[in-house]
């Protein structure tokens, strides 16, 4: 029908101009900023080259900021009031309600005393019991980045490894197009998935009953599908021989996508949540427990559920007013540093980069464009950071190298280079070009002005840097590369990348 209703090409010329302007601007920033920083750093004795980019540099800086926060984190002790509660039918634990943290033990003891209670054993009573039936829907279908994040979490595969495995499954006509940014499908996809439910269940080796037979907005929403729908299995299910030809990661990814798709048709996970409030003098303790009532879709993820098991206790049967023996305790704990990025959590951070900026307009634009990078490019950006030796992976955690740290310190004062805000500012105006409300020439002129600003500011920024950590690291690397002494001149013989 599209070919029967062809539109004049000039109707879409502004979109071409928008994309062309973005490409020119990226090129201008990269071709000027990269040699500018490289040459200025080389003048200070730093070897190697440094490349910068609108997406690459803010991504590196995200990891750098997180690493700095971890390295500079100072643990602080705090105290909380907890309770071990014993009733006729069993025992359970409770936490102070509302939760409070105390900086010192003395502060906690004074608080407990002010509530006519004490640390240690004393009598209490069950003040309230509430039980509600709750449900949990099956997980959303996968976009590329959500699948990459999940596979990294479960199997420690890198984003690029997942994309490569996905590409193979797509070319084998087993999974849909991988480079998609939406977790939704249309009613057409829902219909064929429903028709092939039996084949997918058979592949999983389970006799499953389809319960959710009507499309639900959580998964099926044509208005949220543009070029490509969520990642789902095709009508073709692999044979035993086809499965045997797949590598291990491909088998795991295919099974994960099939399970997530099949789960959409299974019953919800149902459970009872019970909240017990226990009163000791004027102290109130809350205890929460969950009792599964219907396993539903979780039957597909039993192993995964075991690994991700919530720390939720099973509560005994109690009645309001029941007597309880309560052991009130002072629990000493420590504040915890932020967690280092993995490739999976970094992908999520790139997609939700709006959370790292303060400007409301920038936040709005970043939400619209879904952060920095695209579904198709984020994996290659992370891979590029590794290849350029800005970051390395240690036990699945992303760590910034001394070279990466030096670059981040060098660009630190140039907010537009380190923040996702540049993407927001660009996209705001680029969208205007696409709507014929903006001018390509004006935009490129502003980019050139920014480059002139960099030419003036960067040499001063480099002058202020402390190179001691970088030089120390380089000296250690140089020592490791020494393989012996030259018998003729007595100088060190060193291993280099090439001869």
PLM regions: where:
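C-terminal accessory/connector segments of nucleic-acid motor ATPases
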Residues: 73-94, 122-165, 173-174, 342, ...
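Short, highly charged
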Residues: 52, 109-113, 119-129, 140, ...
């Amino acid at each position: 029908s599209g070919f029967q209703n062809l539109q004049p090409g000039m109707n879409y010329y502004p979109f071409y101009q928008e994309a062309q302007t973005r490409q020119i601007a990226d090129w201008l920033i990269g071709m000027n900023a990269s040699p500018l920083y490289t040459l200025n750093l080389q003048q200070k004795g730093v070897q190697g080259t440094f490349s910068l980019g609108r997406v690459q540099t803010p991504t590196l800086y995200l990891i750098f900021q997180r690493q700095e926060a971890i390295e500079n984190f100072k643990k602080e002790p705090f105290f909380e009031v907890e309770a071990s509660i014993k009733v006729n039918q069993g025992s359970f634990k409770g936490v102070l309600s509302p939760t409070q943290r105390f900086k010192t033990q003395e502060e906690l003891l004074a608080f407990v005393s002010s509530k006519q209670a004490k640390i240690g054993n004393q009598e209490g009573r069950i003040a309230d019991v509430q039980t509600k039936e709750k449900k949990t829907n099956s997980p959303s279908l996968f976009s590329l980045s959500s699948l990459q994040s999940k596979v990294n979490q479960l199997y420690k595969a890198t984003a690029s490894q997942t994309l490569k495995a996905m590409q193979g499954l797509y070319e084998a006509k087993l999974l849909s197009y991988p480079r998609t940014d939406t977790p939704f499908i249309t009613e057409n996809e829902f219909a064929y998935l429903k028709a092939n439910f039996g084949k997918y269940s058979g592949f999983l080796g389970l006799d499953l009953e389809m319960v959710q037979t009507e499309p639900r907005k959580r998964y099926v929403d044509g208005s949220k599908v543009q070029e490509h729908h969520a990642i789902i299995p095709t009508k073709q299910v692999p044979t035993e021989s086809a499965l045997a030809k797949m590598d291990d990661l491909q088998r795991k990814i295919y099974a994960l996508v099939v399970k997530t798709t099949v789960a959409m048709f299974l019953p919800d996970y149902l459970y009872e949540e019970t909240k017990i409030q226990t009163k000791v003098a004027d102290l109130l303790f809350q205890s929460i427990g969950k009792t599964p009532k219907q396993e539903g879709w979780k039957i597909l993820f039993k192993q995964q559920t075991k690994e991700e098991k919530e720390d939720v206790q099973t509560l005994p049967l109690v009645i309001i007013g029941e007597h309880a023996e309560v052991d009130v305790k002072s629990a000493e704990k420590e504040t915890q540093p932020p967690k280092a990025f993995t490739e999976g959590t970094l992908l999520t951070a790139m997609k939700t980069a709006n959370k790292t900026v303060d400007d409301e307009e920038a936040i709005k634009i970043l939400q619209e464009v879904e952060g920095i990078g695209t579904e198709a490019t984020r994996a290659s950006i992370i891979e590029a950071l590794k290849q350029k030796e800005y970051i390395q992976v240690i036990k699945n955690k992303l760590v910034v190298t001394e070279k990466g740290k030096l670059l981040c310190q060098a660009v630190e004062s140039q907010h537009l280079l380190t923040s996702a805000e540049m993407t927001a500012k660009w996209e705001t105006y680029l969208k205007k070009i696409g709507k014929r409300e903006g001018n390509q020439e004006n935009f490129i002129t502003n980019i050139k002005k920014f480059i002139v600003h960099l030419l003036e500011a960067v040499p001063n920024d480099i002058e202020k840097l402390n190179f001691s950590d970088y030089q120390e690291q380089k000296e250690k690397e140089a020592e490791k590369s020494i393989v012996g002494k030259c018998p003729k001149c007595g100088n060190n013989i060193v291993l280099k990348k090439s001869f």
